[in-house]
Structures are given as structure tokens and as C-alpha cells.
Regions:
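Feature captures the catalytic ectodomains and active-site-proximal regions of enzymes
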Residues: 1-169
Length: 169
């Protein structure tokens, strides 16, 4: 998806460890961050710029600082901080901006049998001024997100996912 977005001449901005996860493939710009708060600051700064494409942000503290370490209070505090930031962030979105929030796996801080990833379904929240409210149910694959993002950006991209763009707009 990132390579297709970049090849289409659009911005493909990586914030956090996204650049490393994909070995630098497909990003047109990247910036690391030191914490969730710093990542949210970068997201706010990029949203204020006039760019066309994708800004892909990874807030790693949920996983590394709180989930794997089974720090329930830290996780709750991080969610509270993120929630407060998100409200302000969404208010500042442009008319056609869309935000997708998800996770790549579960990491329940209350599960103490192991510090490995846990097997919950992860949320998928879609926000924007023109996004229709509702439930999309359980998606079959993360590839649905790639199919949706590329469709919304008008980028040709073959993958096994099913776009949900028509469900949200």
C-alpha cells in the first residue's frame, strides 16, 4: 500500500517506527518520536500541513511501555491522554480528512499468564467530518484497511482486502 501511494505521487508520511517496520519502503517522509505524546504532536503538526496522501502513525507506548509490561494504570492513563488529544485533533481536521485508528494486535495489560501479545479483536475507529456513523462489524482482514485507504486516495492497488469506503462515506 505504501509503495503504491508513493508511486502515485502522493505523500506517504511515516511517524514513529513505521519507517523501520517497512524498512523505509513506501514513505516519502518520516520522523521518529520519543513517546505517544510526541507522536501525537507530530500527527497534529502534519494534519495542519497541506498534504495529500497518508500520514501513518504508530503510538508504540501502548504496546511496549504498558501492554507487554502489564501496567494497567499506565495503559489507562495513556488511553485517557490519547482520548483527550483525539477530541481536539478531530476538531482540527479538514473537510475531507479521514482518521483510521486501529492496532495490529491485542496486548491486554491485565493478562498476566504471559507478556506476549493477546488475542482480542482490535478496534477500528473511523473519524472525519463526512464519515457516516455506524458499525462495520468484524472485518476479515487488515487488508481491508489498505483497500479502503487506497480507494479513498484514488490509488490503484491490488490486494485481497475489501474496501469499506462506501460504508463510511
Amino acid at each position: 500500500m505504501l509503495d503504491a501511494i508513493k508511486a502515485a505521487g502522493l505523500d506517504s508520511i511515516a511517524v514513529g517506527k513505521i519507517h523501520d517496520i517497512f524498512a523505509g519502503y513506501g514513505d516519502t517522509e518520516y520522523v521518529y518520536h520519543k513517546s505517544n505524546a510526541n507522536g501525537m504532536e507530530h500527527a497534529t503538526n502534519y494534519a495542519a500541513k497541506d498534504f495529500h496522501g497518508l500520514c501513518f502513525v504508530n503510538l508504540v507506548d501502548f504496546d511496549m511501555q504498558y501492554g507487554h509490561r502489564r501496567d494497567i494504570d499506565g495503559y489507562a492513563n495513556a488511553l485517557t491522554e490519547f482520548d483527550a488529544w483525539l477530541g481536539d485533533f478531530v476538531k482540527g481536521l479538514g473537510e475531507d480528512d479521514i482518521v483510521l485508528i486501529t492496532a495490529d494486535h491485542g496486548c491486554d495489560p491485565a493478562y498476566t499468564a504471559t507478556t506476549d501479545h493477546t488475542r482480542e479483536y482490535v478496534p477500528l475507529l473511523v473519524l472525519g467530518k463526512n464519515v457516516k456513523p455506524g458499525s462495520m462489524g468484524t472485518r476479515k482482514t487488515f487488508a481491508d484497511i489498505a483497500a479502503t485507504v487506497t480507494e479513498l486516495l484514488g490509488v490503484e492497488y491490488e490486494n485481497p482486502g475489501q474496501s469499506f469506503a462506501k460504508e463510511i462515506l
